[in-house]
Curated annotation (Swiss-Prot):
Pfam families xref list: AAA_17
Organism listed in the record: Methanocaldococcus jannaschii (strain ATCC 43067 / DSM 2661 / JAL-1 / JCM 10045 / NBRC 100440)
Keywords noted in UniProt: ATP-binding, Nucleotide-binding
SUPFAM superfamilies for this protein: P-loop containing nucleoside triphosphate hydrolases
Residues noted as binding ATP in the record, renumbered to the chain: 8-15
Official protein name in the record: UPF0200 protein MJ1399
Family in the record: Belongs to the UPF0200 family.
Lineage summary: Archaea, Methanobacteriati, Methanobacteriota, Methanomada group, Methanococci
PANTHER family found in the cross-reference section: DEPHOSPHO-COA KINASE (PTHR41930:SF1), UPF0200 PROTEIN MJ1399 (PTHR41930)
Single GO term (MF): ATP binding
Length: 197
C-alpha cells in the first residue's frame, strides 16, 4: 500500500484532494475529521479555538503522532485491500515519520498565501473557520507550532494554489499521474527525518 499525504496551511486547498480521489476512485482519510470528531466527543462546540486546543491536547495525551496513529489504525482496519490511500491534512513531520515507519508515503504540499487562504476560509464558512484576521493568525501560529512548516518544506511535490480551483486540480492530476506511472518507485518511498527530538 502507498499513502499519498496532503499537507498545507488552513485554506490552502487541501480538500481539493477529494476531487482527485473521486476521479481516480481512491479512498481518502481526513486527519482533520479525526480532530473534529474528538472535539465533539469531548462535548465542545466546533470553533477554531476548541478544535485547535483539542489537537494540542491529543498530542499532549498521546504524543505528537496521536492523530496519525488514529488515521493509520482506521486505514489498516477499513482500507487494507487498497493499493493507494490519500491522507488529507498531515500537520507535522512527526506524523510524516509515523506514517513512513509503517507505510510508504509520498507527501504533497499545497501552498497559498495568507491573504488568499483567509479569503477562502471566510467564504468556506466551516464551523471551525473564522472571518476574523486575528483568529486566523492565531490558528496559523498554532499550526506552525505543530511543525507543519517542516512537513511543507520536505514535501515531495508542491502545488502553488493561487489561481482557480481547476488550476489546482490540474496540478494535482499531473502529480497523481507521475505517481501512478512510477508506482513501484514510490512504494519504496519511506525515508524518515528523525532529527526532531
Amino acid at each position: 500500500m502507498l499513502l499519498i499525504g496532503i499537507t498545507g496551511m488552513p485554506g490552502a486547498g487541501k480538500s481539493s484532494a477529494y476531487e482527485i480521489a473521486k476521479k481516480y476512485n481512491l479512498p481518502i482519510v481526513s486527519m482533520g475529521d479525526v480532530v473534529r470528531y474528538e472535539t465533539k466527543k469531548r462535548g465542545l462546540e466546533l470553533t477554531p479555538e476548541n478544535v485547535g486546543n483539542t489537537a494540542i491536547k491529543l498530542r499532549e495525551e498521546f504524543g505528537n503522532e496521536a492523530i496519525a496513529v488514529a488515521c493509520l489504525k482506521y486505514i489498516e482496519e477499513n482500507l487494507k485491500d487498497k493499493e493507494i490511500v490519500i491522507v488529507e491534512g498531515i500537520r507535522s513531520l512527526y506524523e510524516v515519520n509515523y506514517f513512513r515507519k509503517h507505510k510508504p508515503l509520498v507527501l504533497i504540499a499545497i501552498h497559498s498565501s495568507p491573504l488568499t487562504r483567509f479569503e477562502r476560509l471566510k467564504k468556506r464558512g466551516r464551523e471551525d473557520d473564522s472571518a476574523n484576521w486575528e483568529v486566523f493568525v492565531e490558528r496559523d501560529l498554532r499550526e506552525l507550532g505543530f511543525s507543519i512548516g517542516h512537513a511543507i518544506a520536505l514535501a515531495d511535490f508542491v502545488v502553488v494554489n493561487e489561481k482557480s480551483f481547476e488550476d489546482c486540480l490540474n496540478q494535482l492530476d499531473n502529480i497523481l499521474q507521475e505517481i501512478l506511472n512510477n508506482l513501484e518507485k514510490y512504494k519504496k518511498y519511506n525515508f524518515i527525518y528523525e532529527t526532531l527530538r
